[in-house]
């Protein structure tokens, strides 16, 4: 405990923090001067760099938003064009199917007409040949019947 008492009796040395001599204002001037120097050397360039980066980020975001809006417009436009192309292709396909069906029906009608014509001409030709064959056979029958009659009469 005596060491505490000795410490308490000891006087405060001079030149402390709260002495009112020229050191306190000199230290204040040094702090202000160092603040200006640090501001000029360190804080302003860093502040400029930070501002430039913020401006770059802001402009990049604005550009990205513009590009995104442009992409969305293009996507909507292309989607609409795709819808139109699909609709047009479906129309073309339907028209082509109708045309093919029409051509098929026309070809079928023509083939049936040609088959009917061939059948009719064949029937006429057969009728002509039949008539010629009957006429020829009639002549042969007449000749044979005359021959038979002559032989029968001759044998009597």
Swiss-Prot record:
It is a single-pass membrane protein. The keyword Nucleus does not apply. One of its GO terms (cellular component) is organellar chromatophore thylakoid membrane. F(1)F(0) ATP synthase produces ATP from ADP in the presence of a proton or sodium gradient. F-type ATPases consist of two structural domains, F(1) containing the extramembraneous catalytic core and F(0) containing the membrane proton channel, linked together by a central stalk and a peripheral stalk. During catalysis, ATP synthesis in the catalytic domain of F(1) is coupled via a rotary mechanism of the central stalk subunits to proton translocation. It comes from the Eukaryota. Its main location: plastid. It holds the Pfam family ATP-synt_B. Belongs to the ATPase B chain family. In plastids the F-type ATPase is also known as CF(1)CF(0). Gene3D superfamilies: F1F0 ATP synthase subunit B, membrane domain. It comes from Paulinella chromatophora. It is found in: Plastid, Organellar chromatophore thylakoid membrane. The keyword Transmembrane applies. This is ATP synthase subunit b', organellar chromatophore. F-type ATPases have 2 components, F(1) - the catalytic core - and F(0) - the membrane proton channel. F(1) has five subunits: alpha(3), beta(3), gamma(1), delta(1), epsilon(1). F(0) has four main subunits: a(1), b(1), b'(1) and c(10-14). The alpha and beta chains form an alternating ring which encloses part of the gamma chain. F(1) is attached to F(0) by a central stalk formed by the gamma and epsilon chains, while a peripheral stalk is formed by the delta, b and b' chains. One of its GO terms (molecular function) is proton-transporting ATPase activity, rotational mechanism. Keywords: ATP synthesis, CF(0), Hydrogen ion transport, Ion transport, Membrane, Organellar chromatophore, Plastid, Thylakoid, Transmembrane, Transmembrane helix, Transport. The chain crosses the membrane at residues 23-43. InterPro entries: ATP_synth_b, ATP_synth_B-like_membr_sf, ATP_synth_b/b'su_bac/chlpt, ATP_synthase_B_chain.
């Amino acid at each position: 405990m005596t060491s505490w008492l000795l410490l308490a009796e000891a006087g405060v040395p001079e030149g402390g923090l709260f002495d009112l001599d020229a050191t306190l204002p000199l230290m204040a001037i040094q702090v202000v001067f160092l603040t200006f120097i640090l501001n000029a050397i360190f804080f302003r360039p860093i502040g400029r760099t930070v501002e430039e980066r913020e401006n770059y980020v802001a402009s990049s975001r604005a550009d990205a938003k513009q590009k995104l809006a442009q992409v969305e417009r293009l996507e909507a436009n292309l989607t609409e064009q795709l819808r139109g192309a699909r609709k047009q292709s479906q129309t073309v396909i339907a028209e082509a199917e109708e045309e093919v069906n029409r051509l098929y029906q026309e070809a079928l009608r023509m083939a049936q007409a040609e088959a009917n014509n061939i059948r009719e001409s064949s029937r006429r030709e057969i009728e002509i040949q039949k008539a010629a064959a009957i006429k020829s056979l009639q002549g042969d029958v007449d000749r044979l019947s005359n021959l038979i009659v002559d032989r029968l009469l001759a044998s009597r």
